[in-house]
């Protein structure tokens, strides 16, 4: 008997908006366990960003996406990468994640909400709302989260093992965000 693929979840837009908040929970978890000495530390002889710079950038880029793609949403204040503290960064990231989640919910709604296109920057062509928008937003955060983890490690401030593994505990992260983990049909079959 041929395998029939499962139908997409009817709650897919809501689940994608929630997944963005779970993604930010990973940022929060990283910052909760980051040694404070790593926040502004620099590698000797390097001109790269500090961890403070990285997370200020993540937040400020989210604000740019919101300003360009969802101007009807109230923007959180931008972060000054030279002055922000880890506590301020955590609060700002939480605020911009909520706004980005709201933007995704509107962009993916049927019928569509007020978000008609996704603009990454003034130079970039607009994208229609959808999977590419969601993937780009998640990938941007994940890329910079990886940079921060690697930089902390290189600086000698490696995350505690349990914190590093917790970044991959999706079931627990979903629950920490107050969401019910999406479930699908049980199958022992490999993807074909």
Where are these regions (language model features)?
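Helix-adjacent hinge/juxtasegments
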Residues: 67-109
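Short, solvent-exposed, charged loop/turn and helix-capping segments
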Residues: 34-38, 106-109
């Amino acid at each position: 008997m041929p395998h029939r693929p499962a139908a997409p979840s009817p709650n897919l837009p809501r689940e994608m908006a929630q997944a963005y908040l779970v993604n930010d929970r990973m940022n929060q978890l990283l910052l909760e366990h980051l040694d404070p000495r790593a926040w502004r530390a620099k590698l000797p002889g390097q001109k790269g960003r500090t961890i403070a710079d990285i997370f200020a950038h993540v937040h400020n880029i989210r604000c740019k996406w919101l300003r360009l793609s969802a101007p009807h949403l109230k923007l959180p204040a931008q972060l000054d990468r030279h002055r922000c503290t880890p506590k301020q960064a955590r609060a700002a990231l939480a605020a911009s994640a909520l706004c980005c989640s709201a933007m995704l919910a509107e962009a993916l709604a049927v019928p569509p909400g007020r978000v008609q296109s996704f603009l990454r920057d003034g130079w970039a062509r607009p994208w229609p709302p959808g999977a590419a928008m969601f993937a780009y937003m998640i990938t941007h955060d994940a890329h910079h989260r990886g940079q921060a983890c690697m930089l902390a490690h290189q600086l000698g401030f490696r995350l505690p093992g349990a914190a590093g593994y917790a970044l991959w505990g999706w079931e627990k992260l979903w629950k920490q965000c107050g969401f019910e983990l999406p479930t699908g049909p049980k199958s022992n079959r490999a993807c074909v």
